[in-house]
Amino acid sequence: MDLAANEISIYDKLSETVDLVRQTGHQCGMSEKAIEKFIRQLLEKNEPQRGPPQYPLLIAVYKVLLTLGLILFTAYFVIQPFSSLAPEPVLSGANSWRSLVHHIRLVSLPITKKYMPENKGVPLQGSQEDKPFPDFDPWSSYNCEQNESEPIPANCTGCAQILPLKVTLPEDTPKNFERLRPLVIKTGQPLSSAEIQSFSCQYPEVTEGFTEGFFTKWWRCFPERWFPFPYPWRRPLNRSQILRELFPVFTQLPFPKDSSLNKCFLIQPEPVVGSKMHKVHDLFTLGSGEAMLQLIPPFQCRTHCQSVAMPIESGDIGYADAAHWKVYIVARGVQPLVICDGTTLSDL
């Protein structure tokens, strides 16, 4: 109010001054044009100026808060970890029935009956009842027979040997690594929630799908890790050491010393069981949850090789030679699935 009253009084004085100048000009015989020019020059030289801001501290605090907000907003998107996995599409009715029929065929397998909860303790027919972990004979989803008259391509020799999928315990694992033979090792050592959370804090570069807010993850990992997000200037990770740190049982297994961990990712339960297959490398570990393992030969080997399917559970370690098999994991059950994807090849 004081500032407005001040400006009004200034303009009143200027108006009086202009009237006085105009009268004086007329008395001195000046022309109207000369008087207007003189008044314009007078007004330009005496234009009223606004005073300094009345609350400089408040304005300074406002600018600081605005700048800090912009910095935090930018930093959030710069260091935001990998976004969550895209939601899986719900299959149409035809595809749902196809998936249902596919799983009905899986349930009819002897190995599936062995591991289903309602069939625990029911012995298998024949000599299989004496074996705790029998070799799993492959089955073909195409019911195709091998054509012995056709030559076997070089990249199909591994799966064409019909080596059964060996299911074993860690202490019964062969001492020598057999690269061509598929293997499932039942360790019975799943990852706990605390181990998974600690691992995601320590090695955020090798985790994916663990959706958390920026400040939520920072607060959970503090003070163990000050900045639990991937950043480009960090030293390269020793992924072989990380694999054995997360799963100490690998120190007792015959896999190559340079076997390494590629990534651990979290998969939420799917609306339609079996609607999504997740491809992994030749070596993997099921940290938690239940899944179906599927080994599919390359397309050019379908006439000589057969697909393999088997249910797996938390703590299971699987291996299949990537040159002869495509390895897929299909989530099942209602619990989230944690898959740690690795490899026995040093160049990956």
From Swiss-Prot:
<keyword id="KW-0472">Membrane</keyword>
<dbReference type="GO" id="GO:0032963">
    <property type="term" value="P:collagen metabolic process"/>
</dbReference>
<keyword id="KW-0325">Glycoprotein</keyword>
<dbReference type="GO" id="GO:0097709">
    <property type="term" value="P:connective tissue replacement"/>
</dbReference>
<dbReference type="GO" id="GO:0005886">
    <property type="term" value="C:plasma membrane"/>
</dbReference>
<feature type="transmembrane region" description="Helical">
    <location>
        <begin position="59"/>
        <end position="79"/>
    </location>
</feature>
<feature type="topological domain" description="Extracellular">
    <location>
        <begin position="80"/>
        <end position="348"/>
    </location>
</feature>
<dbReference type="GO" id="GO:0042060">
    <property type="term" value="P:wound healing"/>
</dbReference>
<keyword id="KW-0812">Transmembrane</keyword>
<dbReference type="GO" id="GO:0006338">
    <property type="term" value="P:chromatin remodeling"/>
</dbReference>
<dbReference type="GO" id="GO:0045787">
    <property type="term" value="P:positive regulation of cell cycle"/>
</dbReference>
<comment type="subunit">
    <text>Homodimer. Interacts with BRS3. Interacts (via N-terminus) with SIN3B.</text>
</comment>
<dbReference type="GO" id="GO:0006914">
    <property type="term" value="P:autophagy"/>
</dbReference>
<keyword id="KW-0735">Signal-anchor</keyword>
<dbReference type="GO" id="GO:0050673">
    <property type="term" value="P:epithelial cell proliferation"/>
</dbReference>
<feature type="topological domain" description="Cytoplasmic">
    <location>
        <begin position="1"/>
        <end position="58"/>
    </location>
</feature>
<dbReference type="GO" id="GO:1904975">
    <property type="term" value="P:response to bleomycin"/>
</dbReference>
<dbReference type="GO" id="GO:0005737">
    <property type="term" value="C:cytoplasm"/>
</dbReference>
<dbReference type="GO" id="GO:0030496">
    <property type="term" value="C:midbody"/>
</dbReference>
<keyword id="KW-0333">Golgi apparatus</keyword>
<comment type="function">
    <text>Exhibits histone deacetylase (HDAC) enhancer properties. May play a role in cell cycle progression and wound repair of bronchial epithelial cells.</text>
</comment>
<keyword id="KW-0963">Cytoplasm</keyword>
<protein>
    <recommendedName>
        <fullName>Bombesin receptor-activated protein C6orf89 homolog</fullName>
    </recommendedName>
</protein>
<dbReference type="GO" id="GO:0000139">
    <property type="term" value="C:Golgi membrane"/>
</dbReference>
<keyword id="KW-1133">Transmembrane helix</keyword>
<dbReference type="InterPro" id="IPR038757">
    <property type="entry name" value="BRAP"/>
</dbReference>
<dbReference type="GO" id="GO:0048144">
    <property type="term" value="P:fibroblast proliferation"/>
</dbReference>
